Amino acid sequence: MKMRFLGLVVCLVLWTLHSEASGGKLTAVNPETNMNVSEIISYWGFPSEEYLVETEDGYILCLNRIPHGRKNHSDKGPKPVVFLQHGLLADSSNWVTNLANSSLGFILADAGFDVWMGNSRGNTWSRKHKTLSVSQDEFWAFSYDEMAKYDLPASINFILNKTGQEQVYYVGHSQGTTIGFIAFSQIPELAKRIKMFFALAPVVSVDFCTSPMAKLGRLPDLLIKDLFGDKEFLPQSAFLKWLGTHVCTHVILKELCGNLCFLLCGFNERNLNMSRVDVYTTHSPAGTSVQNMLHWSQAVKFQKFQAFDWGSSAKNYFHYNQSYPPTYNVKDMLVPTAVWSGGHDWLADVYDINILLTQITNLVFHESIPEWEHLDFIWGLDAPWRLYNKIINLMKKYQ
C-alpha cells in the first residue's frame, strides 16, 4: 500500500511538471500558503501576538493571540477569553485558514472576545524543548496523555496570568476535546478555570470509528514503528508545501486534493471552499509523534479511554505506579459542556458520540448536524451560521 501511494504521488508530480511546462491551467496561489499563523492573522487586518510557553516537562509551545477584532479595536477594556485547541495532526492555523468572515478565530475576535490558539507539542510551531532536540527519540516520547497533563495547564495558566482573567472558554476540535476531557477530569484546579467547554466533533472512544485511521490502528505496534519509525508522524514539509502550491492549485487536481483532506474523516466536499485548498494543505498535516499515533492505535484495539500502555507491567509501573494504564473517567469532569457532532463523521462516529453523551455530567447542549463530517467544524462553508453563531450565543448566555 505504501508503494502504491508513493507511485501515485510520483505520477501526480510528473504530470504536474509536464502540465506546467505545456501551459496547463493553474489557479492563483493564495498568499497565506507561505505565511505562518501570525502572518495570516495580520494579513486579514487583525492584531496578532505570539508567545512561547514552557511546560512543566520542558516543552516550549507557541500560543497565537488575536486580542481584539477589526470592529472593536477602540475598546481597551478586558474581554472574555476564548482558548481554541486544534485536533490531531493539526495546528493553530485551523482556526484562521478560511476567509475572515468564515474562520472561527476571526469571528470570535470581531464578536468581542480575546482569542488564544494553542499548538500541541511536536506540531509545526511547537518543536522546541529546554534540553532535547527534535533529532532525539526522547523528544518524541509523548502522546495525548502529556498534552493533557502538561500542555493544557501550561497554556491556560499562562493565558489567565497574562489577561488577568479567572476563567476561559475552551473550544476543542477532535483530539482537542480528547485532551480537554482528560485534563478537566484529572486536574480539578484546572477545571475550575474553564467557564464552559465547547466540544466539536469530540473523540473519546473509537469503538465504532470507520476511518482508515482505525484500520491503521489495528496493525501491531512493531509494524507501525517499522513503517513510520520512532519519532515524528506526518510533519509539514517542503515537499507537502510544494504539492499544495503546485499540484493543489491545478484546476483538474484541486478537487483531488480536497478529497484527500476528507480521506480520513468522511466526505462532504460540497461544503469545502475549493479556492482555499492550497492554504489547508500547506499547513496541514502539521505533525505529531509516532507514539501519539500508537496511543490512538491502542484506543482502537483495547476500546478503552486510558493512558498510554508502555508495553510491559514493569514500564507501566515505572510511569503509573501500577502494572496497567489508568483509565480516564469523563464523569469526573464537572465543567459545563456543549457538544456538536456530525452525522457523516468517520472519526467521531454517531454511536461513539451517543456513548460519550451519557458520560458527560454537566451537559448543557448537544446538536448533531446530519450532513457534517469531521472537518466541517473548522472549514465548512456553512459553519458560521450553523455552528459559530450558536457558540457565541452560548458564551454570552453563560458569561
Curated annotation (Swiss-Prot):
Molecular-function GO terms, alphabetical: sterol ester esterase activity
Alphabetical keyword list: Glycoprotein, Hydrolase, Lipid degradation, Lipid metabolism, Lysosome, Signal
Single GO cellular component term: lysosome
Annotated InterPro entries: AB_hydrolase_1, AB_hydrolase_fold, Lipase_euk
Residue ranges of every copy of the AB hydrolase-1 domain listed in the record: 80-380
Record flagged with keyword Lipid metabolism: yes
GO annotation terms (biological process): lipid catabolic process
Function (record text): Catalyzes the deacylation of cholesteryl ester core lipids of endocytosed low density lipoproteins to generate free fatty acids and cholesterol. Hydrolyzes triglycerides (1,2,3-triacylglycerol) and diglycerides (such as 1,2-diacylglycerol and 1,3-diacylglycerol) with preference for the acyl moieties at the sn-1 or sn-3 positions.
Subunit structure: Monomer.
Name under which the protein is recorded: Lysosomal acid lipase/cholesteryl ester hydrolase
